[in-house]
Amino acid sequence: SRQVKEQLIKHNIGQRIFGHYVLGLSQGSVSEILARPKPWNKLTVRGKEPFHKMKQFLSDEQNILALRSIQGRQRENPGQSLNRLFQEVPKRRNGSEGNITTRIRASETGSDEAIKSILEQAKRELQVQKTAEPAQPSSTSSSGTSDDAIRSILQQARREMEAQQAALDPALKPAPLSQADLAILSPKLIPSSPMSSVSSYPPLALSLKKPPTAPDTSASTLPNPPALKKESQDAPGLDLPGAAESAQGVLRHVKSELGRSGVWKDHWWSTVQPERKSAAPPEDAKSEEAGGTKEKGGGQGHGPIAASSRDPHHRRSTGRNGPALSPRTPQSSELSLTGASRSETPQNSPLPSSPIVPMSKPAKPSVPPLTPEQYEIYMYQEVDTIELTRQVKEKLAKNGICQRIFGEKVLGLSQGSVSDMLSRPKPWSKLTQKGREPFIRMQLWLNGELGQGVLPVQGQQQGPVLHSVTSLQDPLQQGCVSSESTPKTSASCSPAPESPMSSSESVKSLTELVQQPCPPIETSKDGKPPEPSDPPASDSQPATPLPLSGHSALSIQELVAMSPELDTYGITKRVKEVLTDNNLGQRLFGETILGLTQGSVSDLLSRPKPWHKLSLKGREPFVRMQLWLNDPNNVEKLMDMKRMEKKAYMKRRHSSVSDSQPCEPPSVGIDYSQGASPQPQHQLKKPRVVLAPEEKEALKRAYQQKPYPSPKTIEELATQLNLKTSTVINWFHNYRSRIRRELFIEEIQAGSQGQAGARHSPSARSSGAAPSSEGDSCDGVEAAEGPGAADAEESAPAAAAKSQGGPAEAAVAPEEREEAPRPAEKRSRRPRGPGPGPGRRGGGGPAPGAPAAPAAAARGPSRRPGARAKPRRRRRRRRRHARGGGRRYLSRPARGGPCRARDGAHRSSALPSTSAPAAARRPSSLQSLFGLPEAAGARDSRDNPLRKKKAANLNSIIHRLEKAASREEPIEWEF
């Protein structure tokens, strides 16, 4: 088991292939045997059989080489199931070890010497089988072994085949198999046909599938029988066991293969594609057919065919094998010419073919297998997969290669697998042998040893095709050469990326692709209902990027892949300028040009990424923008779209509004320019609800009782005030929002005042720790509370109604107005005593009022312990009240604050004698808050003006809202 595992890993042979061809077991059974082999003495007779076969397999190097060639062809034709080989013959597992090697070697690869040795071995094994036939009665045919019957069948088949070949000779002359090779090969066919031995049927299946490459579906004859006839002539000593009946069975099988291969051949010649991997089952048959493939390139030049191509004497009978001549997986039409040069005939010559025949299913990506040498270089090295994938991604982005093409041509994986592997590579040590293969391929690709002739297909291979397309399509897209390259690559890359066409065929398909989409392109791009009114624009359309979207999505992707590096910042800047200058919206631009939403367009235009950091998908919008900028008629087309949208919108709006009230054209125009939908515009036309002062008072009193009224309360209020329920709900919502805004303004102002006072108080710098806590507890709170009172008083004329809700409010209001400057006065008095510390918010400024100092000093020590916790509690309480209700919030100035209560008589006596700055006594709340010019300093210069501006702006907005709300007549908002 260990030796077998080593050989399988060394030659990159899968356990599934090994199990099918050598052990006759499933992959799971093989894995179990190799991973956990039982001791010999514990095995049954049947359990020992796989080990006998493995020993026989290891005894000859040719077995390993043959199995490796089968594995290589299986990788080249991944769509083919291995079970296809086992359909024609019943499967059994009791073949002798000699037969195991037979079936492996039947599909051997290698040089001429290897092929000859295989053929000689086949002769010997046929003789062994012939002698063993009496022991296998089931394998002998009951019809007798008449050579004459078989020869007559073979001669008839030969005549039919020569007639077919004569019809194809002008167009095809690939190298046929030599008669000698066919003669040597064919003994395997007839004897193994009647035999049910599994060991010999793969040669039968393979060699039967070899010739069915005749292109004509109607010609249902077999190319093989001539070879069989020659064999029967060349090896007369062999007693052919197959009777007429078995030979007829062989003929029937081969005819069915011929029918399928004829269909495939028509398709192959219709697209002139030499790639075998894209062919359906008959194609797989050809890849399985031959004696072997070359090992070195991991390619698929089969033994007899390769030999025939080297021997000029062989160029005769199997003209249908043309495509099989290319020794490795053909990746482009140039490789088909390689095969053609061997056959001395151009393969691009026109042939009667039916391009209608579709492929049975899309071909899976397939790549040539890696050679053992390539495996050995990297398999046992430690590879940094993260760095490797990073380099691969960079190279893909630099060369504009899509992951799909890279996966199909280099890794043999789907786009999803490639994306997953490149984004989340596993560590090398955690990868299985199969998991390491893609990374080995990536490394070889980076080193230029793999796939270099494949990837340029995307941008360079079809250069002549591009020129022919542009010459054919000069009326189309004359302004933008790059857009002409789009259909080119889409034709080669998108429909059948793994099968590039010849230039003549692709030009034909490209002209169709380029000519057809142009008229419908505008419609598909616009995607708007009023598009039919825009046919004249489609004449001027060709130079715009809009037609690009009319092609397949891949066409723009391929254009992106070939695009040179673009200045994304410059492109977005120009686009923004054009849109702004012409009053075009981003939504219209995004939907019409880029196929994106307004949000995506805004993001692209405001924060464009550098080109090299963008994926292919991310580059697409910038390519579209560039093409749009290059179009001289770009603005006119967008303006037309805008006008059509406007007309459609007005029609919809008119139909929706006509029932209730007529819409006025000017207002509709304004609504459209704002880009709003019909429903919001309809709501904006409703008359504005204006509440009477009595209604406002009643609602405010209700708010003080319950800021969040229940539905029942709302209904009662609406009934009492004769208002709509929705009006009452909206009033409560708006009033709560106003309270929150005022609290926000107060916090901003309090913070700016505290910072200004703390930074510039001379005594603050020399104050001690204990007095600073006292100052913080007192001034900090009042500085936060006093301004709120003044601001609420000044900014809202009806603010007093918020707090008291009764007669008391008249008595409280004057007191509040007088208290507005108190924070400034307190700040001016306090610092004589121990003032707040330098970093405190509630510091004071230099001012008269010396008597305040001793009192502050006396108060300080007794209040120090709880000084810090109280302001925090108060702030939390204040936020709760701001959310829950405005009653206590607005009555806060009346109760004064904790410090005012503690100051006692000293505070009340100091107030009248204090001469505060004149600015602090002004009615304007802003001036009372920010009226101390000496409070501004160098360190505060950066953030204080910004805070002032914010507060002033919010104050002015609220003031205007209050003024507008207090008016009787309905007016529009003015900002």
Curated annotation (Swiss-Prot):
Cell compartment(s), UniProt: Nucleus
GO cellular component terms listed in the entry, alphabetical order: nucleus
Pfam families: CUT, Homeodomain
Gene3D superfamilies xref list: Homeodomain-like (1.10.10.60), lambda repressor-like DNA-binding domains (1.10.260.40)
Comp. bias (Low complexity): 490-506, 756-773, 780-813, 850-860, 907-929
Keyword DNA-binding: yes
Cross-link named Glycyl lysine isopeptide (Lys-Gly) (interchain with G-Cter in SUMO2), sites: K229, K255, K286, K724
Protein family per UniProt: Belongs to the CUT homeobox family.
Protein name per Swiss-Prot or TrEMBL: Homeobox protein cut-like 1
Organism in which the protein naturally occurs: Canis lupus familiaris (Dog)
